[in-house]
Each structure stands twice: as structure tokens, then as C-alpha cells.
Amino acid sequence: MLRHGPFVKALLLVGLAVSVFAQPTKWTPEAMIKYKRLLGTAISPDGKWVAYTVSEPLLEGEKSEYRAQIFLAAADGKMDFQLTQGDKSCTNPQWSPDGKWLAFSSSRGGDKNNIWLIRPFGGEAEKLTEAKSGVNNFAWAPDGKRIAFTMNNPLSEQEEKDNKEKRDAIVVDENFKFAHLYTISVEKNEKGERKAKRLTSGDFHVGGFDWSPDNKWLVFDHQATPRVNDWPTGLISLVPADSGAVKPLVAKTMANNPYFSPDGQWVAFGHDAGDTRWAGRTDIYVVSINGGAPRKVGETHDQQANILGWSADGKEIFYGETERTSPRVFAIAVSGGKPRTLTTGSGAFGGVSFSADTKTMAVVHQTPEQLPQVYVSSMLKFAPVKITTVNRDFPNHAMGRTEVIKWKSKDGKEIEGLVTYPVNYVASRKYPLVLNIHGGPAGVFTEGYTGASSIYPLQALAAANYVVLRPNPRGSSGYGVEFRRANINDWGFGDYDDDIGGVDLLIEKGVAHPDSLGVCGWSYGGFMTSFIITRTKRFKAASVGAGVTNLMSFTGTADIPGFLPDYFFGQPWDNLAAYQKHSAMFNVKGVSTPTLILHGEKDLRVPLSQGQEFYNALKQQNCPVQLVVYPRTPHGPQEPKFILDIGNRLLDWFDLYIRGKNGGKKTS
């Protein structure tokens, strides 16, 4: 069966009163923030229509949010219209098997996500569920009579009473609110009601799931607790769709993302073959529903396959994976062999969905200079036809060209990255360069649209005559397991050589000016930025975004305490020297690079204290430094006004300390 769905307190905030609706003549953060995000596709069972979701930034008055709505486009490109409206987001559209209904998620009429139903060609949406704690995932039964969903255990009456009376002390790692499986009938009973039926219970947390083709079973993955740190405990089980005992299917840990075969006799799933590491691998396996040993289907390029479903004839499994700088869709034969690429050509492909007969696909495609749009193609031969014009009112300014470049690191390892040149680039001129480092460290820079609003406004930097280098150093995804693990026990050294090697290449080519360098990054990119400025004074300015600056205190305060002990072969008390050697905080003496530190107040992944430690260390040494803390913000900024603020602050900081000017704007 195929599921349809898409593929990481300001101390002083000023300048937000400037209208974000002014019409700049070149790329600026104000221009880029208007970008609407295309979230994914859901093609109808007959392949004739595609539902897709667009998230629009709202910045008027007190608003600072993204609101998503569902649109519908004909596969022949002749019709395209907005389906849902309102002041609450509507996401995750899923077609009923007969194509007569679309189910979607929304918090309409409350503050919790529930499942809603709507006719695709007219009529009002109808609320299906009344999930007290909100619906997580959902999926139609193959016969269209029921929908399965997951919901976290709600608060008990006593817990609600305690909350009201301020008796709500929290005991850490106890009383988890596990997610469990439920079903609900689409048709109302004789009393005009719909009642959800709970299928699972107990001390485990349900993640992904799929229906059997005969509607009798649900296969699901589950882990020990909802904690992010417990992902290695993933198992796969079966449960009868009408209620009954849970039946273990895959007892090997780190098993996830199960899908039934079209004949209902097999389940495909992702598994790491016991090679469980945070710099992970996910191979594709199949197992009989009657049990037995799982069988590995074959090797994929990056061994990080995200299973998308089966072909209608049951001979192939579809999956998504990044190949170097291009996210793509692939198929691999269940009998084994090499994968075949379904989405050929340059750029990035994602948000894919398939018709019921798997003869037609819908996919979101984009390139560095081309906006993301929905395309439809035959599965026999990839010949995508564009059927949407999302962001038709988005600025059409001249763009800085982006290309993939390669270089050799100090140890001879080949490194790849993306360079975005200034708008109106002149080959005889040397430009200031910004080294932008991705997160992860197992992230990857891909060939996505560079005009999109993001933490770092690429085209605004290009319009301001900066060259932007985005390397994929050792530790990145997209280049295989060995490359992804090449930075184990080596953060800040081999990857440092990789990053600096790309900078040196652009200097040698006469593209970048050696005395006008800046560096920035978020998360692991923030770690790398903080560590780089402890090793060299070549950079005139730096910006550390939600960066890990002290490996020891990070391990003791983050929501993933198992992360760094895996990378550094033990806990801090067992390998103290490594944690000190690879931490900016233990090498911070003498740092003089002007540094802008940006951090979310509610960041659980990299707690705010990481930014505060580095800020205080630089402040005590009279190094130019500014710490900006964003209220309500988790590990990445979610509010468009904050994204806008970050972009403007970054540009101002680099202009001030790289070029010796600030463009007439304040930097504090």
C-alpha cells in the first residue's frame, strides 16, 4: 500500500517596524521572506488530480506565522485552485481510495490537530475525529471505510486538575505520553456518531504504520519511549484492525517505516543491520508477515533510504534518498540488484506521491534558479510536466548563479560543495566570501531554490556582492556511509580542512578576496563556526547559530544525550581529552573574531546555555560579540519575523566587520 505525504527572547529586537511589503529592486531578506513553501503532493488514485500544500508567511501586525492551505491541480495542467480556506493551517491531504474524499489535518475550531474530510470539488469540510491530545499521523483503510491514526495519551482528569491547581511538578523520564494506534469509521453509526477504537496500549511509542491490503491488519513501528534519544530501540509489530493482541514482527532494533506489499504477504521496512550509529544507515529489508528472518533487498547509494511504498505489481520498492547534491526518487527490485533512478536530471526532487496503479507520479522539483513546482510524469519514462505556478507573484530579480564545485582536502579526500556567485558577477573581480556550514553533521547542501527564505538568505547575500560557499564536508549525507562516518572522533579537524580547502580554492581562482572572509552556520554548522574561529584569524566576522560550543555540557543538557558519546567513543568522564580537544569553549582563549550568536530560547536540541557560554567567554576577552535570543523558538526559527530579523542581522554584521560598513542600519 502507498501512503501519500511529503518527503532539523531577543535581547533587543529592532527594525521590525519596517514594512516587509516594500518593493525592493534586488534580493533582500524582505523580498525573500514572501516566499511560499510548497510542502508536498498527494496524487489521486486515478492519477488525474494532485492535491498539494502551500505554506504562506503572515507578518501583518501581531502575526508572525506560516499558514498552510491545500490546493488542487489537474494532472493535465488545465486547472489549479485553492481547496481549503480559513485562519488555521490545513495540511497532509490524503485521498480516499475511491477518490471521492480528501482527508486532511487541521486545528480548526480548537488548538489540537484533528482529521477533517472534504469533497475535492466543493462542499464544506467535516470534522472526523475529536482527538483530545491531537492527531499525529493518519491513513485510509484500503476499502475507504476507516481511517487509522496515532494520538498521544491525553492528560488524565487528575493531571488536568493538578495543572489548574499548580500542583504540576514534572518528574523527568516518567509518565510518558505514548502515542498509540486508533481507528475511526468514516460513516456514522445509527446514532449519528463516530467513535474511535483504540488498537494499542502499553509502554511503547508508535511511529509510522500501514494498512494490509485486506483491511485486516496494521503494521507499525514503535520505540521504547517518545524521547528522541530512544530511536535505536525501534521495533515492528502487527495488530488486528478490529482489535486484538499485538504480534511482534521484527524484533531487531532500529527497524522502522513499514509498508505492506500489494499481496499482503510481505512487509518492507528500513533497518540498519545492527550497525546502529547516529551517523546512521538505513537499508531496505523485507520480511514475511508469518515471521522469519528479514532479507536485505540491496544496496542503495547513500544507505539512507526513506521507503515510499511498493509498485502495484509488487516487484519494486520505491524510496527517496540524496545522491550527492540531489535528493531523488529511486526504485529497487525486491529480488535484488541495483536501484534505478526514477527522477532524472539536475536539481532537487521531493514530496512525491504515486497513483494507485503506480503508473503516474507527482513530484516537487526545483533547481537553484528555478522555483519549486509540482510536476506530473509517467513512471515508464520520466518526462515531468509542470502543473502549478506557486509563488507566481514572487520577485523575479536577477539571481546569483549557483554551481557544484569539487576540491581535494588536505588528506586527498574529494569534497563537493555549492558556490553561489554575486549577482552580475565579474570574473576579474575578487569578492568577499561567506562560508556557510550545514547542520547535522549528517546534513547536506542540495540543489534547491536559492531564493527561498531560510535562516541564511543566499540571494540577498549574492545581491550584496558576497560569494557564498556551502561545502559538504566529511560527515555529510549523500556520499555514502563511509563518508558520513569519516568525522567520527574528529569534529573540527578533518572537516575543518574540507571547509577551508573550498575557501582556498575560490581564493586561488581569484573569486574570493583572502582578506574579506566570513563564516556562519546553524547547529553543527554553529559548532563548526565557533571551532573555526578558535583555530584561525582568517575570518573577519562569524555568526554562530544554535551552535554546540561545549561538548561536555551539551551532552549533559541536550535532549539527545547519546549523540556525542557515539561520535566520540564514550562519555565525557571516559574520554575527557576528546571532549575538551573538540570543544570551542576549551580552546576559546585568544579568539578575536567579531561574532554574532543567534539562539532560540526554547531550544531543547542545543540548549541556549551553549550560546551563553560562548558569549560570556568572548565578552570576557573583549572580543566584539552580540547574543540575540529568540523567544518561543526551538532548534530552528519558526516565525517569519525572526527569520527576517536573522537575515538582516547577518548582513549587517558581515557588512560592518568584513567591509567596514553597516549599510546605515543598527546592529544592536
Question: Whereabouts are the PLM-identified features?
Answer:
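Active-site-proximal cap/loop segments of hydrolase catalytic domains
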Residues: S454-A464, L469-S668
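Conserved beta-strand position repeated across blades of beta-propeller domains
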Residues: A42, Q94, A139, D210, ...
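Non-catalytic accessory segments flanking enzyme active sites
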Residues: A42, L58-E60, A148-T150, E157-E159, ...
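Multi-bladed beta-propeller domains
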Residues: Q23-R37, K63-E65, L72-S89, S106, ...
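Hydrophobic beta-strand positions that form the internal "hydrophobic ladder"
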Residues: G47-V50, G99-A103, I147, N215-L218, ...
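Short beta-strand element of the alpha/beta-hydrolase
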Residues: R429-G440
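Short glycine/acidic-enriched loop and turn motifs that connect beta-strands
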Residues: E56-E60, R108-D111, P154-E157, T225-R227, ...
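Residue-level detector of Asp-centered blade-edge/turn motifs that repeat once per structural unit
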Residues: P45-D46, P97-D98, P142-D143, P213-D214, ...
